[in-house]
Structures are given as structure tokens and as C-alpha cells.
Design a protein with these regions (language model features):
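Active-site beta->alpha loop and helix N-cap motifs at the rims of alpha/beta catalytic domains
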Residues: 2-145
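Catalytic alpha/beta core domains of metabolic enzymes, predominantly
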Residues: 132, 142-226
């Protein structure tokens, strides 16, 4: 059964930039405040929608610190740390832990169209990141091109203590969510809908307890999810 801790609307914060390409730090704070004011249950940062692929390592660290410190515990912050390198992903996870961040989100390891982790490598990366001691959401997104079969996800949930949540936004998302919830039982604490909520109703019927879309209309999505 899904944990009531992981439910509701958890939008992805966009990253604002100035006209010269620099991060707009004050704008980032306003983005955070806007979402908190809309009573969201949590906020995700540095995700694909947040332009993560345009950010340098230094900019990522600046944003991680700024967002977690500015939210200041008002809602949980999920920090995306996806990387092909397990060492880099683990380093990012440790920073989040040091800053008091509540959650991490990760896609499986991939690079480009052809470099993809095997099921064992995927498991090992998540297991290593789990050693940082921060709750992990697995992002099953089509962007990675990596297949994450339900048995693998359930194995991760059962054997990696910090893997608790699953954002399912691949093709046939509702069917996958249903299988994950039914077969994983109590180990699937946070089954989430994603991909801009285009399958939201089907995903909720399948057992999703939360939604993670962009930050455009959380005030409209939240009442539907709850």
C-alpha cells in the first residue's frame, strides 16, 4: 500500500535564467515561493524540465543549495541527480544529504542513444546511491531509452532500503503502475504519475498516489490527485 507521505502534487521547478545566460537566483526563489503558495506537497529541482542538461556542475551545486535552503523545510525537496557515472551520482547524493534535502530522483544510467546500464549495473548504481541515506524516487522516463521491467523495480524496492518511490512515465504507464503496485505491495511506497499528467486519470485508477509534472498548473492538478 502506498505511503500517505508520498501523495499529492509534486511539480518540477523550472530554472529561470537572465538574458545573459546566468542563473536568476532571485527568480528561482520566486519560483519556489509560488509553488509553496499553491500548497504543493513537494517540489522537484534539477529535473529534465529544469534544463538540467544546460547546467554546469557549479551551477547545479548553486541551485541545490539555494533551493533547499530557501524552501527551508516548508515542503520536501526532491533533487534530481541522474548521471551515467555512479561516483558522480553518489557525490551529488551526499551533497543533498549534507544540505538536509529529503529526497533524490534518478533515471537509470545512460549516455546518448546506445550507452545504457545493464539491469545489474542499474541495481548497483541505485544501491550505491542509497548508501547516502536519502529516499530515492526512480524515474522511469522514455528519455533514457532504458527498459525498467517491473520485476527489476520490485527487486530494487525490496533490497535497497532507500528506494521507495517510482515515477512511471513510459509507454503503457498505467499498466506498469498497476503491476508495480499489485506485485510490489507495501514496498511501493510512492507510485507517481508523470509525463505532464497526460495519463493522469488512468494512472490514478491504476494506483498512483502522486503526480509530478511541470509547474504550470499545480493548482489545477492537485485537487484531482487528492
Amino acid at each position: 500500500m502506498a505511503n500517505s507521505e508520498f501523495k499529492g502534487c509534486w511539480p518540477v521547478a523550472p530554472t529561470p535564467f537572465k538574458s545573459n545566460g546566468e542563473i536568476d537566483k532571485e527568480g528561482m526563489k520566486r519560483v519556489i515561493d509560488c509553488m509553496v503558495d499553491q500548497q504543493v506537497e513537494g517540489i522537484c529541482i534539477l529535473a529534465n524540465y529544469s534544463e538540467q542538461f544546460l547546467l554546469s556542475d557549479e551551477e547545479r551545486e548553486i541551485l541545490t543549495r539555494l533551493c533547499i535552503e530557501h524552501v527551508a523545510g516548508r515542503v520536501p525537496v526532491i533533487t534530481t541527480i541522474s548521471h551515467f557515472s555512479t561516483d558522480i551520482a553518489f557525490s551529488r547524493a551526499k551533497l543533498v544529504k549534507e544540505l538536509g534535502g529529503e529526497m533524490l530522483m534518478m533515471m537509470p544510467p545512460y549516455h546518448g542513444a546506445l550507452m545504457k546500464g545493464t539491469p545489474q549495473q542499474i541495481f548497483e548504481q541505485f544501491a550505491k546511491v542509497g548508501e547516502a541515506g536519502v529516499t530515492i524516487m526512480v524515474q522511469d522516463a522514455p528519455l533514457s531509452g532504458v527498459d525498467l521491467p517491473v520485476p527489476l523495480l520490485i527487486k530494487m524496492a525490496k533490497e535497497i532500503e532507500m528506494v521507495k518511490c517510482f515515477k512511471i512515465e513510459c509507454a503503457q504507464a498505467a499498466a506498469k503502475l498497476r503491476a508495480l503496485v499489485n506485485e510490489g505491495g507495501e514496498y511501493i511506497e510512492g507510485p507517481f504519475d508523470g509525463e505532464e499528467g497526460i495519463t493522469l486519470f488512468a494512472d490514478l485508477e491504476a494506483g498512483a498516489t502522486g503526480n509530478m509534472s511541470s509547474a504550470m498548473i499545480p493548482e489545477l492538478i492537485r485537487p484531482v490527485v487528492l
